[in-house]
Amino acid sequence: MNSRRSPLLVFSGQSNRPLAQAICDNLGVPLGRSRTEKFTNDNLIVHYEESLREGDVFIVQTFSTPVSDAIMELMLMIDAAKSASAGRVTAVIPYYSYARSDKKDSPRISIAGRLVADLLQEAGADRVLTMTLHSPQVHGFFKVPVDHLSADVVLSQHFKKCVPDAHNGVVLAPDAGSIKRASQIARRLDSGLAMIDKERLSDTEVRPRALIGDVDGKTVFIVDDEISTAGSLVETVSIARSMGAKDVYVAVTHGVYSGPAIERIAALDVTQVASCNTVLVPQDKLDRAGGKLAVLDVAPLFASAIANIHTGASVSTLFT
């Protein structure tokens, strides 16, 4: 796509307009004018209030509660943009919630991660930009290009800011699935690495087995892709404390904070729990967490990725 003839246009759904506005502020472009209405029968309709013809359109929509509304609104925005003769449409999905559903692990279920990918492409998405998929293989469900950003740099910088001698600490992976991310952050911090071996019994219940590594007397940095109900986090912190951890910091990409998560975090024996602004955390949740929650800004990273996609530059250079 020739960026000289294709204006950069950024629009937002309703799920996380503050992030979309911050992305535009970093890009130095105005947030596009659009509105979504809901009829009395619960149907949605999207209106663009400016021309999209031949534009390089980026639509920011995170898949947070209510997830089904967020997905439907994004598909309507993509379809409306294509109908308005947009030159290219990129779906910017900071948090892709159906990434957990990546395989058929029980009879008679849908692989929802693949289904949502199919729906987005059928709606007309030419490209997808997302961050820290729970299951990276979801990337392969798309036939269109997917740029998968990592928040590792942001999380690492945050730990260094909180603890100047972070290199003396230990990065703790809550399970085997997060060891790759933890090892990358440990490399950036030049710190130690540990892992908890555990068994997941259900979506909300885990059974820890053992901590592999040494955390005794050390500052521990727990990293993961997301916090949902915080049940797994409670177990991880409990084990780390029982093994002699001194101070505990937690940082994840996506702070979903569903169900009893906020109450659990407020009671948790940690210094701080940080998450990125891929999911909008309401002020009342921040207040109820007793000052333990922090929000990290990934708008500059998304803005750089959008700028590089628009001009045809590499995106992978942003987090290597």
Curated annotation (Swiss-Prot):
Annotated binding of Mg(2+) 1, by residue: 134
Entry's EC annotation: 2.7.6.1
Binding site for D-ribose 5-phosphate: 200, 224
GO terms, biological process: 5-phosphoribose 1-diphosphate biosynthetic process; purine nucleotide biosynthetic process
Leader sequence residues: none
Binding site for ATP: 41-43
Cofactor binding comment, as recorded: Binds 2 Mg(2+) ions per subunit.
Entry GO terms, CC: cytoplasm; ribose phosphate diphosphokinase complex
Pfam families referenced in this protein's UniProt entry, alphabetically: Pribosyl_synth (PF14572), Pribosyltran_N (PF13793)
Gene Ontology MF annotations: ATP binding; kinase activity; magnesium ion binding; ribose phosphate diphosphokinase activity
Cellular location(s): Cytoplasm
SUPFAM superfamilies: PRTase-like
Xref: NCBIfam families: PRK01259.1 (NF002320), ribP_PPkin (TIGR01251)
Annotated function: Involved in the biosynthesis of the central metabolite phospho-alpha-D-ribosyl-1-pyrophosphate (PRPP) via the transfer of pyrophosphoryl group from ATP to 1-hydroxyl of ribose-5-phosphate (Rib-5-P).
Family: Belongs to the ribose-phosphate pyrophosphokinase family. Class I subfamily.
Subunit: Homohexamer.
Name of the protein: Ribose-phosphate pyrophosphokinase
Annotated organism of origin: Deinococcus radiodurans (strain ATCC 13939 / DSM 20539 / JCM 16871 / CCUG 27074 / LMG 4051 / NBRC 15346 / NCIMB 9279 / VKM B-1422 / R1)
Taxonomic placement: Bacteria, Thermotogati, Deinococcota, Deinococci, Deinococcales
The gene coding this protein: prs
